[in-house]
Every structure is written in C-alpha cells, then in structure tokens.
C-alpha cells in the first residue's frame, strides 16, 4: 500500500516525546491511523501530498543561543531536508509532495522579546534560502496572508479573539495530562533561558513567575494559530517541530541533528563536527573552541578542529 509506505518513510524522522516505547521502533496501527486516510485521499485524487509545518518563526533574541537575527546554516540544512523529503516521496509516488511552512513568528513576538522588524528580516532570509536551494516543493504562509489592513498588534489580538481558548482550559490540561505538561515545560524552559540573559536586573524568582505566565500565553496563541491553519488547510497532514506523542495527529519531525529533543535552528547555532551539522547553544560551541564561518557578510556556522571533532564523535558513540 503506497500510502503506508510513504508514512513509514516519514516516520523514520519522527521526533517523539519518548523513544522508550515499542512504537518508537515499530509504529503500530494506532500510530498510523490519523494520517493514512489523508495520504490516501491525495493519492486517489492524483494530487501532491500536502503537509503543513508551523515553524521558522524568527531567531531567539538570546545571543548565548544563536548567531544573530538572520537565518544561517541551521535553517539552510533544515530547509534542504524538507525539500529532500518531498523529493524522496516523489520516488514512491509520482505526484510527490508539497510542504507549506506556516511561519508563526508574528504570532507571539511580544511574548518572546522579538521585534516585528526582526521577524520580517528573518522571513526575507528564509525566502532567499528557498530560492538558493531551488526548493520548488516548499511555500510559506503567515499571519499577514489572513489578516490584511491591520497592524501587527491588531493581527495578534484578532487571532486570540477569534481562535484562542481560555488560559484556564490550557492550565487544566497541563495539570491533568502528561503530554501537555511536557509541552508546557519545554516552552517554559525556552523562555526562561532567554529571559535570564535578556533581563539580568530581574531576580530569578521574578523571571520564573513571568515565564510561567508567558508560557501559557505562548501555548494559547500557538494553539490558536494551529486552529486557524487547520481551517485553511483542512485536508493537509500536520508536521511539527516539537516532539509528539506516538499516537498524535501531528508528526513531530527531526530536520537536523540536535543535542536535545527540543532543539531547532532558531534557538541554536549550527556546528559542523567533521561529519555532519548539528545544533547546539552558541555559548557551548564557543566554549569548546569552534571557529566561526561567515557567508555573504553574515555569520553562517561553526567548524571544529579535527582534534575537538574526534573527541565529540567519541563522546557521541559512548552516549
């Protein structure tokens, strides 16, 4: 069955909340069930299989994490992976696949200390990268495609008003369901790491309280964006850059090697270790003595000396 062959191919790159259950190695019928009918529908209509991926928002404002506000080699490798994935699917199914990146940076810039100007610059950089790698299977979708004639603040308020759930209902799920609790913790720690650096005059306790509240707001808007995107692309398969439960209706996906389950190009810097690119925090990369590479007047990635690279490869093999 072509649809199952395609799905199992995609599942090779699944990003899961846990990799200890049998489903991590051999997806069961419940793992496949949310996605197979959608793939089969595209096949029956001889159409490209369409995926949506909320991702590529903007770079973290934390200089200890990233190289700056513009896309770098991390984004380039991730976008090339997505294009390659579509190319691989076309070898299984003649009509191939398409991916729409639903850029959510504008959705919560005010919550994560990113300016709208930097969101715009980042998005322009992403489009340049797509052109450079000839990514003909990828297009983009953003808040401006939906709400026209509004300021960015008005767009965000309209999104929340029309699509958001009450914060209280999100808190209830976080308190009662482990998968929601893990997601909350992931968002909280991303915010906390940034706020510690960005607001050095605030106490740790103040930042903990603020990030706790902000994390719920980020999840609220993220869910609202998910609902909006789902209404615009009701038949599409949903990819996610966040780790997912085995039986989720979203497919968490690894686009580039990371040092943890939550790593993304916009919260890390890319480093070439002599074998492959991987994502790590910028400060950690610099602490181990990697050298910075520039491209087109922008910082691109780091490279390790052979000696340090071999040491890291040895450590990776032991872990």
Curated annotation (Swiss-Prot):
**EC number of the protein:** 4.1.99.25
Q: Superkingdom, according to UniProt?
A: Bacteria
Q: What keyword terms does UniProt attach to this protein? A: Lyase
Write down the chemical reaction(s) this protein catalyses. Answer: D-ribulose 5-phosphate + L-tryptophan = (2S)-3-(1H-indol-3-yl)-2-isocyanopropanoate + hydroxyacetone + formaldehyde + phosphate + H2O + H(+)
- Name the InterPro entries on file: Isocyanide_synthase_DIT1 (IPR007817), PvcA (IPR017133)
**Would the keyword Lyase turn up in this protein's UniProt record?**
yes
First-tier enzyme category under EC: lyase
User: GO: which molecular function terms?
Assistant: lyase activity
| UniProt function note | Involved in the biosynthesis of ambiguines, a family of hapalindole-type alkaloids. Responsible for the synthesis of the isonitrile group on tryptophan using ribulose 5-phosphate as the source of the carbon atom.
Query: Which family does this protein fall into?
Result: Belongs to the isocyanide synthase family.
What is the name listed in the Swiss-Prot or TrEMBL entry for this protein?
L-tryptophan isonitrile synthase AmbI1
Protein's organism: Fischerella ambigua (strain UTEX 1903)
The record lists the lineage as:
Bacteria, Bacillati, Cyanobacteriota, Cyanophyceae, Nostocales
Tell me what gene encodes this.
Answer: ambI1
């Amino acid at each position: 069955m072509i649809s199952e062959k395609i799905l199992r191919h995609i599942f090779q790159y699944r990003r899961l909340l846990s990799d200890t259950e049998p489903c991590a190695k051999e997806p069961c019928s419940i793992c496949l069930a949310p996605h197979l009918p959608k793939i089969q529908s595209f096949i029956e209509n001889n159409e490209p299989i369409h995926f949506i991926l909320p991702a590529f928002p903007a770079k973290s404002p934390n200089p200890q994490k990233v190289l700056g506000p513009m896309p770098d080699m991390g984004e380039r490798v991730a976008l090339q992976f997505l294009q390659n994935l579509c190319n691989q699917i076309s070898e299984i199914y003649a009509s191939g696949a398409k991916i729409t990146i639903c850029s959510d940076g504008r959705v919560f810039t005010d919550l994560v200390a990113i300016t709208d100007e930097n969101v715009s610059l980042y998005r322009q950089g992403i489009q340049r990268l797509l052109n450079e790698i000839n990514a003909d299977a990828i297009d983009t979708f953003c808040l401006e495609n939906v709400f026209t004639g509004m300021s960015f603040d008005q767009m965000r308020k309209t999104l929340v008003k029309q699509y958001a759930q009450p914060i209280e209902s999100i808190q209830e799920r976080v308190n009662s369901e482990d998968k929601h609790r893990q997601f909350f913790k992931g968002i909280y720690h991303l915010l906390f790491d940034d706020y510690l650096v960005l607001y050095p005059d605030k106490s740790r306790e103040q930042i903990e309280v603020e990030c706790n509240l902000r994390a719920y707001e980020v999840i609220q808007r993220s869910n609202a964006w998910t609902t909006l995107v789902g209404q615009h692309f009701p038949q599409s398969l949903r990819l996610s850059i966040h780790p997912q439960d085995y039986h989720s209706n979203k497919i968490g996906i690894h686009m580039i090697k990371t040092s943890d389950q939550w790593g993304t190009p916009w919260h890390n810097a890319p480093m070439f270790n002599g074998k492959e690119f991987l994502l790590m925090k910028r400060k950690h990369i610099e602490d181990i003595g990697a050298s910075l590479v520039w491209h087109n007047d922008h910082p691109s990635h780091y490279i390790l000396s052979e000696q340090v690279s071999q040491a890291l490869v040895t450590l990776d093999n032991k872990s």
